[in-house]
Amino acid sequence: MNGTEGINFYVPMSNKTGVVRSPFEYPQYYLAEPWKYRLVCCYIFFLISTGLPINLLTLLVTFKHKKLRQPLNYILVNLAVADLFMACFGFTVTFYTAWNGYFVFGPVGCAVEGFFATLGGQVALWSLVVLAIERYIVVCKPMGNFRFSATHAMMGIAFTWVMAFSCAAPPLFGWSRYMPEGMQCSCGPDYYTHNPDYHNESYVLYMFVIHFIIPVVVIFFSYGRLICKVREAAAQQQESATTQKAEKEVTRMVILMVLGFMLAWTPYAVVAFWIFTNKGADFTATLMAVPAFFSKSSSLYNPIIYVLMNKQFRNCMITTICCGKNPFGDEDVSSTVSQSKTEVSSVSSSQVSPA
């Protein structure tokens, strides 16, 4: 084995030289130079100082502007709450531990941090899945003239939390466990060891299939069908300038949504699965640290893609920040664009974009 396994940790370095120490007791500067830990601190501080205000502003403008409190926007509020969850309970801890060079809060603190970080990340992940399903139902109408209500929206939100708990809670009760990962200053599920007491193999397979593969399939299917629907409607209207603009806007938004999701979760899932299937293989601390930080960065670009790129949300935010005035003019576009002359207007960008 090319790593060192302790009672509740796994350090990706052999202890033949005797330098490996518990990540709960000593700085881990033998894994990476101190400046790399400071770089992590700077990165986490950037995420906190940018993601926290944007997500708080999302909640504020939704509360202040009644026109934003529509059932199709509930999941965006849930996404903002999940991102705030990650920032408050995950990023702040990582910042402090990275500054010290090791996980100073001990095994119990590691389990708590790992749980909250996983919970927030999973709520955000499943919010994107529910968002894709909602857009598919509203635009593609697989159930006919289905009326999407507040009850359906709340059911979708409840589903995200149930799925998140089903992923984050098991390691607290003996199905896998949380331990320091990467540079040993943040915690995640145990992908590294064969310990039969924790049944890590079955948990990792469960997590990979249920909490990554299935969301990817659902998102690709939902947004793929949505784009096809928009193009069909545009073709029926003989590619007028309006329908072409709507088609391009919808396609661009969908591509950004899918790329954002894949950028956040694919690197982490792939590296974690590689470590899981190659236990004992040689890998550096940064191999797991970098993908983990990719997933954390979703708390910043999620609101950018799903909120700030939406005209209605963006204009309401500008109005709120500027004390009731919009210095850029009134370009508010309601998410309930009038459905009158053409079929494509029923699948316009304002309906399939995240508002």
From Swiss-Prot:
GO terms for molecular function: G protein-coupled photoreceptor activity. Keywords: Chromophore, Disulfide bond, G-protein coupled receptor, Glycoprotein, Membrane, Phosphoprotein, Photoreceptor protein, Receptor, Retinal protein, Sensory transduction, Transducer, Transmembrane, Transmembrane helix, Vision. The color pigments are found in the cone photoreceptor cells. It holds the Pfam family Rhodopsin_N. Disulfide bonds join C110-C187. It is a multi-pass membrane protein. It comes from the Eukaryota. The chain crosses the membrane at residues 37-61, 74-99, 114-133, 153-176, 203-230, 253-276, 285-309. The keyword tRNA processing does not apply. Residues 62-73, 134-152, 231-252, 310-355 are cytoplasmic. GO terms for cellular component: photoreceptor outer segment; plasma membrane. Residues 1-36, 100-113, 177-202, 277-284 are extracellular. Its main location: membrane. It is found in: Membrane. The keyword Disulfide bond applies. Phosphorylated on some or all of the serine and threonine residues present in the C-terminal region. The modification N6-(retinylidene)lysine is found at K296. InterPro entries: GPCR_opsins, GPCR_Rhodpsn, GPCR_Rhodpsn_7TM, Opsin, Retinal_BS, Rhodopsin, Rhodopsin_N. PROSITE patterns: G_PROTEIN_RECEP_F1_1 (PS00237), G_PROTEIN_RECEP_F1_2 (PS50262), OPSIN (PS00238). Visual pigments are the light-absorbing molecules that mediate vision. They consist of an apoprotein, opsin, covalently linked to cis-retinal. Belongs to the G-protein coupled receptor 1 family. Opsin subfamily. This is Green-sensitive opsin.
